[in-house]
């Protein structure tokens, strides 16, 4: 049974008693930011739980309550930040106050109690891991010599598979196609092994990654209502988490054991496991290596696949933009087997298409939540200052900011041209109306790699193929409805039909 449903049944009588004794308190004369009225004890948990898409629901609430909005998720206070000015305050000006992570059951278990980058609490271990990843794993040099040749090979393979589907007049599941592409890149670069599409090992690997993503998004009662933590065991969700963790741990250990074999031939530049084993020491333990592999897989596969799905969704729904992007890539590239990274620099409209995709469909619609390490004061102006308590979870509403008409003209229109008017808008997190990869100390470490995967992948999709809706559908039938999850994903699968483009 759903753990949330069990909890709601049990919580109603407790909420009634709680209402008799609860009084809202002000701290140092300042109150918390405004927010919708929640249920006693439960807070706003029920409203968010029953919403079809949590980030859309939260974003709509913020339109009513403002750029700083308080929610109560059971016993946990939460702050939703929905303006560039307040995002800058949280992610830059007071970054040191807000740069830690809440320790949640799912992410805590899967990250080996925070031994990696994305979910680790702020501290010396996180700084050491971040430094090692920045200087060793995700460098421009490694992107050039490790990722690039693998990416170009996988692009050729993807184009070949799509050509076969086109010859057979078959519809293609876009997410499966694009995650196969991303999975092959990440697996080859991370541990030097490729899983073929018909190989049982790849099916197991992709299922494991999907199960891990589901656990990151899963609801654990103990995170928000500690006294009811036993419900996680009763519902079975804790057992599922333990099973997924054990499967993941065994998989990582087998990979590491293979790399430790003395007779194993080492690649010219070394894969990511090779690099980490060479740096193994006081802070980088075997569990740390496994935890960082989790970051690489979870951050590099689903996000790339979803970004390409939403890019193709937007282009299919906007044929003017599709044709303009195809004309650019085909006229600039001429006749080549594939579009490579050097070509991307000559395709400003294609790059604007990717930027516009990440504005409308940010990979993390609420970013990975941060947590306030101490009390602080936030406010848009002197008349609207609020006290933020320690241990408040902070969600930066990139979904809402990217669709706010105060900052974007015709925000719901897919219009890549807007980025020619604002060339300063990029992925570095310095313009706070545009934060697809976050900002500050916790900005995504793999921006360059993710950007290259999406740009090169999309360029080749537009260069080699024309695209039609699936059998029996029209372009107008294609929706862009998202679903719940830590990473943005499309609710309804996108099926598309490729047609080989014959270059004149």
Curated annotation (Swiss-Prot):
Main location: membrane
Keyword list, A-Z: Endoplasmic reticulum, Heme, Iron, Membrane, Metal-binding, Microsome, Monooxygenase, Oxidoreductase, Transmembrane, Transmembrane helix
Organism: Pastinaca sativa (Wild parsnip)
Residues the entry annotates as binding heme: 444
Protein name per Swiss-Prot or TrEMBL: Xanthotoxol synthase
GO cellular component terms listed in the entry, alphabetical order: endoplasmic reticulum; membrane
Membrane-spanning ranges: 3-23
Assigned EC number: 1.14.14.-
Enzyme class at the top of the EC tree: oxidoreductase
Pathway the protein contributes to: Secondary metabolite biosynthesis
Annotated region (Substrate specificity), positions in chain: 363-368
Source superkingdom: Eukaryota
Gene that specifies this protein: CYP71AZ4
Membrane topology designation: Single-pass membrane protein
UniProt cofactor(s): heme
Entry's Gene Ontology molecular function annotations: heme binding; iron ion binding; monooxygenase activity; oxidoreductase activity, acting on paired donors, with incorporation or reduction of molecular oxygen
Cellular localization per UniProt: Microsome membrane
Residues carrying the site annotation Substrate specificity: 118, 299, 303
Family membership noted in the UniProt record: Belongs to the cytochrome P450 family.
Keyword check for Transferase: no
Keyword check for Acetylation: no
């Amino acid at each position: 049974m759903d753990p949330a449903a069990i909890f709601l049944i049990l919580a109603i009588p407790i909420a009634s008693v709680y209402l008799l004794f609860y009084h809202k308190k002000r701290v140092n004369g300042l109150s918390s930011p405004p927010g919708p009225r929640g249920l006693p004890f439960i807070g706003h948990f029920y409203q968010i739980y029953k919403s079809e898409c949590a980030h859309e629901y939260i974003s709509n609430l913020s339109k009513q309550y403002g750029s700083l909005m308080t929610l109560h998720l059971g016993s946990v206070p939460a702050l939703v930040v929905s303006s560039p000015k307040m995002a800058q305050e949280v992610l830059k000006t007071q970054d040191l106050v807000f740069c830690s992570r809440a320790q949640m059951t799912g992410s805590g278990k899967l990250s080996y109690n925070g031994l990696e980058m994305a979910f680790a609490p702020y501290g010396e271990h996180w700084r050491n891991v971040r430094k090692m990843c920045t200087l060793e794993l995700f460098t421009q040099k490694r992107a050039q010599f490790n990722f690039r040749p693998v990416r170009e090979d996988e692009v050729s393979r993807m184009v070949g598979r799509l050509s076969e589907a086109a010859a057979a007049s078959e519809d293609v599941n876009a997410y499966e196609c694009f995650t196969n592409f991303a999975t092959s890149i990440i697996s080859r670069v991370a541990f030097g092994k490729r899983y073929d599409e018909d190989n049982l090992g790849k099916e197991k690997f992709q299922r494991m990654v999907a199960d891990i993503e589901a656990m990151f998004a899963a609801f654990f009662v103990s995170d928000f209502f500690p006294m009811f933590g036993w419900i996680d065991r009763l519902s079975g969700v804790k057992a599922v988490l333990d099973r997924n963790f054990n499967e993941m741990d065994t998989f990582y250990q087998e990979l590491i054991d293979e790399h430790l074999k003395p007779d194993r031939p080492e690649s010219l530049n070394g894969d990511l496991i090779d690099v980490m084993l060479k740096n193994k020491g006081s802070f980088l333990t075997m569990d740390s290596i496994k935890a960082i592999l989790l970051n690489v897989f979870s951050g590099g596969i689903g996000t790339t696949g979803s970004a390409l799905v939403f890019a193709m969704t937007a282009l299919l729904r906007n044929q003017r933009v599709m044709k303009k992007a195809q004309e650019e890539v085909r006229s600039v590239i001429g006749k080549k087997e594939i579009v490579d990274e050097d070509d991307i620099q000559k395709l400003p409209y294609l790059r604007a298409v990717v930027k516009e995709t990440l504005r409308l469909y940010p990979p993390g619609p609420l970013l990975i939540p941060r947590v306030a390490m101490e009390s602080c004061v936030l406010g848009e102006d002197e008349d609207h200052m609020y006290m933020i308590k320690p241990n408040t979870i902070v969600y930066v509403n990139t979904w809402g900011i990217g669709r706010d008409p105060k900052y974007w003209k015709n925000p719901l229109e897919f219009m890549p041209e807007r980025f020619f008017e604002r060339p300063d808008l990029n992925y570095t997190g310095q313009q706070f109306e545009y934060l697809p990869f976050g900002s500050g100390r916790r900005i995504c470490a793999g921006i360059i790699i993710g950007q290259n995967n999406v740009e090169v992948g999309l360029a080749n999709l537009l260069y080699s193929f024309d695209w039609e809706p699936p059998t029996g559908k029209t372009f107008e039938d294609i929706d862009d409805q998202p679903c719940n999850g830590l990473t943005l994903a499309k609710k309804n699968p996108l099926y598309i039909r490729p047609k080989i483009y014959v270059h004149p």
